């Protein structure tokens, strides 16, 4: 159900006049910077494209602060398949890289084209959508759309707090996706947010 969307920055964060790209349908969220990596200006980058490295294929992106962000180098980071180490044009030291922390990156929607089928969605479009049940009760928020080899999953952060849960992104579990309303309707198993059971080794 998922389709992969195959000037120096001033990383001081958004100003009072910064655009609200999160609510602008002309832009699609592709990733978010994390903490600085090392001393040479590298920074961790969480990619929301199905192929994480594809985030580097769109040319300069637009930061949530409205400024152009040019990724000059990318490589996989250890620990998570969607985490990268990035170099950014104009960022050469740790302090400048650290100033990028939590800066969201967007691309204009026309750069992505359009999904071919009605049940295909850009993974980046799903990030941040509200998750509700058939009665309309808010259950959580989509934080990621990982795929570990067995099919697309929705990583859902529960509304009441606690550990995120993974739900297969199939029509059986996700009967409705409403991008315009910014919500998905799910038919979850009863134990979706249940704490993980301890392994036999933990009980010894």
From Swiss-Prot:
Domain PRC barrel as annotated: residue spans: 117-192
GO biological process: ribosomal small subunit biogenesis; rRNA processing
SUPFAM superfamilies according to UniProt: PRC-barrel domain, Translation proteins
UniProt keyword annotations, A-Z: Chaperone, Cytoplasm, Ribosome biogenesis, rRNA processing
A GO molecular function held by the record: ribosome binding
Location in the cell: Cytoplasm
Primary location: cytoplasm
Matches recorded under InterPro entries: PRC_barrel-like_sf, PRC_RimM, RimM, RimM_N, RimM_N_sf, Transl_B-barrel_sf
Key word Plastid present: no
Annotated TM spans: none
One GO cellular component term noted in the UniProt record for this chain: ribosome
Subunit structure: Binds ribosomal protein uS19.
Record's comment describing the protein's domains: The PRC barrel domain binds ribosomal protein uS19.
Family: Belongs to the RimM family.
Function: An accessory protein needed during the final step in the assembly of 30S ribosomal subunit, possibly for assembly of the head region. Essential for efficient processing of 16S rRNA. May be needed both before and after RbfA during the maturation of 16S rRNA. It has affinity for free ribosomal 30S subunits but not for 70S ribosomes.
Protein name, entry field: Ribosome maturation factor RimM
Organismal lineage: Bacteria, Pseudomonadati, Pseudomonadota, Alphaproteobacteria, Hyphomicrobiales
């Amino acid at each position: 159900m998922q389709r992969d969307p195959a000037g120096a920055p001033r990383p001081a964060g958004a100003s009072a006049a910064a655009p609200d790209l999160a609510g602008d349908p002309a832009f699609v969220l592709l990733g978010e910077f994390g903490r600085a990596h090392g001393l040479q200006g590298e920074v961790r980058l969480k990619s929301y494209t199905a192929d994480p490295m594809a985030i580097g294929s769109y040319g300069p992106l637009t930061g949530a602060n409205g400024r152009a962000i040019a990724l000059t180098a990318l490589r996989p980071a250890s620990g998570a398949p969607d985490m990268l180490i990035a170099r950014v044009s104009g960022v050469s030291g740790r302090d400048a890289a650290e100033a990028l922390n939590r800066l969201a990156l967007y691309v204009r929607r026309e750069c992505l084209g359009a999904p071919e089928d009605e049940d295909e969605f850009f993974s980046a479009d799903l990030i941040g959508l509200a998750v509700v049940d058939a009665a309309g009760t808010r259950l959580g928020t989509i934080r990621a759309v990982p795929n570990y080899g067995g099919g697309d999953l929705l990583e859902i952060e529960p509304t009441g707090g606690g550990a995120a849960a993974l739900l297969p992104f199939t029509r059986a579990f996700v009967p409705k996706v409403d991008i315009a309303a910014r919500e998905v309707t799910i038919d979850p198993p009863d134990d979706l947010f249940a704490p993980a059971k301890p392994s036999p080794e933990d009980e010894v």
